[in-house]
Amino acid sequence: MTQQSPAFISPIWLKREQLIDVPEPIMLDWLFNQDSLTRRLDRLSDGGFSVFPQFEGWQALRRDECLALGLPLASEGWVREVYLCGNDSNWVFARSVAARSALQDGGLNMDELGTRSLGELLFSDPAFARGTLEVCHYPEAWLPDAVAARGLWARRSRFSRGALSVLVAEVFLPALCNTIHDKDPV
C-alpha cells in the first residue's frame, strides 16, 4: 500500500487543453489515448502482460479522489493498487478507487479481481462510460518505495455505470517510457 498522503500534497489534474508543461508527442499520445491501456500494454509486450496486485482494501479516499468522484472528503472506498507489467517489468503503477456505497449497490466486485486487469473488465462492459482523461506529475510520496521518482506522468479517468463510478489513475513508470521509445515511436 502506498503511504497516505500528507494533507498539503494535492496534484493538479489537467485536461489536455489545460497543459502548459506539455510532454513529448509520444508520451502525449499514450497519456490521452482513449483505448484500453491493458490492450495496448499487451500488444507492446508481445503478449507478456501481467497484473501484480500490491494492495486491496477499504480506506479513506484521498482528497483529490473524493472531489473527482463527487464524494464528501475522507469518504471510505475500496482501493486497489497494482503494477501493470510487461515482460515481468513494472510499467505502470495503477490505483483504482470506488466509494463503498456505490460498490455495494453497483454489482462490481473489485475485491475478486486478483491478477485480472480492471481495465479488461471496464472495457468489456459497454455500460461503463469513460469520462475525461486528466494528467499530472504524480506525487512521489504517493508511489511505492520501489518505484518512487519525481516528475512521473500519470493519467486518470472516471468510469461510470449508473450510480457506480470507479476512478482509475495510471502512473507511467520509467521502464514503460523506455520501452515506448524503443518499440512504439509516433
Swiss-Prot record:
Enzyme Commission designation: 4.1.3.40
Pathway assigned in UniProt: Cofactor biosynthesis; ubiquinone biosynthesis
Name of the encoding gene: ubiC
Name by which UniProt lists this protein: Probable chorismate pyruvate-lyase
Function: Removes the pyruvyl group from chorismate, with concomitant aromatization of the ring, to provide 4-hydroxybenzoate (4HB) for the ubiquinone pathway.
Catalysis performed (reactions): chorismate = 4-hydroxybenzoate + pyruvate
Binding positions (substrate): 80, 118, 170
Signal peptide start and end residues: none
Record Pfam families: Chor_lyase
Subcellular compartments: Cytoplasm
Keywords assigned by UniProt, alphabetized: Cytoplasm, Lyase, Pyruvate, Ubiquinone biosynthesis
Main location: cytoplasm
Provenance organism: Pseudomonas savastanoi pv. phaseolicola (strain 1448A / Race 6) (Pseudomonas syringae pv. phaseolicola (strain 1448A / Race 6))
Enzyme class: lyase
Similarity field: Belongs to the UbiC family.
Highest taxon above the source species: Bacteria
GO BP, sorted A to Z: pyruvate biosynthetic process; ubiquinone biosynthetic process
GO MF assignments: chorismate lyase activity
Biological classification of the source: Bacteria, Pseudomonadati, Pseudomonadota, Gammaproteobacteria, Pseudomonadales
GO terms for cellular component: cytosol
